[in-house]
Amino acid sequence: MDIRAAEISAILKDQIKNFGQDAEVSEVGQVLSVGDGIARVYGLDNVQAGEMVEFENGTRGMALNLESDNVGIVIFGADREIKEGQTVKRTRAIVDTPVGKGLLGRVVDALGNPIDGKGPIQSDERKRVDVKAPGIIPRKSVHEPMATGLKAIDALIPIGRGQRELIIGDRQTGKTAVALDTILNQKPLNVAGAPESQKLYCVYVAVGQKRSTVAQFVKVLEEQGALEYSIVVAATASDPAPMQYLAPFTGCTMGEYFRDNGMHAVIIYDDLSKQAVAYRQMSLLLRRPPGREAYPGDVFYLHSRLLERSAKLNDSLGAGSLTALPVIETQANDVSAYIPTNVISITDGQIFLETDLFFQGIRPAVNVGLSVSRVGSSAQTKAMKKVAGKIKGELAQYREMAAFAQFGSDLDASTQRLLNRGARLTELLKQPQFSPLKMEEQVVVIWAGTNGYLDALPLNKVRAFEDGLLSLLRGKHVDILNAIRDSRDLSDDNAAKLKSVVDGFVKTFA
């Protein structure tokens, strides 16, 4: 037997080349059946719940149903290329997403991949999309205001940083408009050089909306200069149901990065009704037993585990916060349906938007009687508390009287006065889109309304009065606005100054 030196050296070289490299054993399974975005796979015995798997053609999926003889996998993409008998590979990673400030100004899909054509995401940190919510000890009660810039909301239904406030109403009642105005209102807080404790980053999650609608939303954010402090997560109507199910969790993880690093963020889920429908579709196709309205039994848990992740953290953890504004679409104002009642019971209050009010021209179409904030005035500045307490009572009396006044024609003077004031205050709470007001501006406008300065005006002049008063204050009396902003209070001294300015303005206004 002759020994060939070349052969030996080739074997040695081969062994040296592969030294220290253990054979990579990837656990693989076989597709048993596929259809409707669901694949049944045999052979992935050790797969984890929620683990990402990869099909032959590179399409990703998530293992949801772990059964004794097969695994039910939802597919994040088209199932057309996936055939029976193909192999499926474990990735050994639970579904995660990139997080960090590199995402600001970007539009991503439900897996965190960019879809805005601006190149790869600048982020080296990844987090799991479905994590446990903070417990009781890490939390702190909500006490800082999260201003929306809308008088009707900031005065009557105040939202605090770390709160969950539901926006609920029929289609076309201005739910997204409220959310958009809230994002635009954070622009003055997010100026370059502002302290992180003041800034409020925004995450907008679009679920099951038309692509054109999302594109329009992003365009408005860009034009108004609000995209630079915002992240948009989009799972549109043409995306598969698993993507629509996952998008809110992905957005929440991105928002949690700010919360956990001592910063503040607000996340808008627009809307959770469509996420529930996508989850119902997946559950029924996975053959899980249906419950009320054919939703699966754990649809409450779907929303509660998502919304419980919004919290105000205590000082030892950096005092960060994540505020949630989930949106729910009702059918014919029916708030007693399954998903609306679930989300109402999870959140810390709700803003009801009504079709009737919208068509009467009261926009934002907030039904002040049915809307509530369970955090309440602890999330308001002192100045706003002083002026808003009065307006709440007067509007409540007005609503009660207006119902009776329809029947009687001869009303006594005090009732007439009450109805007059109520009509003017309702007019005062109207606000056009894209024109959010700062806290101090809202305070002076509401102060003028509750102190009777509008009572003698015709209804159609209220808007002009408000604009005129604000431009006068912004121009010649900016010191009053600055004093209210800095002290967050309306001191007697400032109230006296404001009174003399408004008295003077009323005389010239005609």
Curated annotation (Swiss-Prot):
Recorded hits in InterPro entries, A to Z, give:
ATP_synth_asu-like_sf, ATP_synth_asu_C, ATP_synth_asu_C_sf, ATP_synth_F1_a_nt-bd_dom, ATP_synth_F1_asu, ATPase_a/bsu_AS, ATPase_F1/V1/A1_a/bsu_N, ATPase_F1/V1/A1_a/bsu_N_sf
Which CDD domains does the record match to this protein?
A: ATP-synt_F1_alpha_C, ATP-synt_F1_alpha_N, F1-ATPase_alpha_CD
Question: Main site of residence?
Answer: membrane
Which residues are connected by disulfide bridges in this protein?
A: none
Site annotation (Required for activity): which residues? 371
Instruction: Provide the reaction this enzyme catalyses.
Output: ATP + H2O + 4 H(+)(in) = ADP + phosphate + 5 H(+)(out)
In its UniProt entry, what is this protein called? ATP synthase subunit alpha
- Native species of this protein? Afipia carboxidovorans (strain ATCC 49405 / DSM 1227 / KCTC 32145 / OM5)
This protein's gene is called: atpA
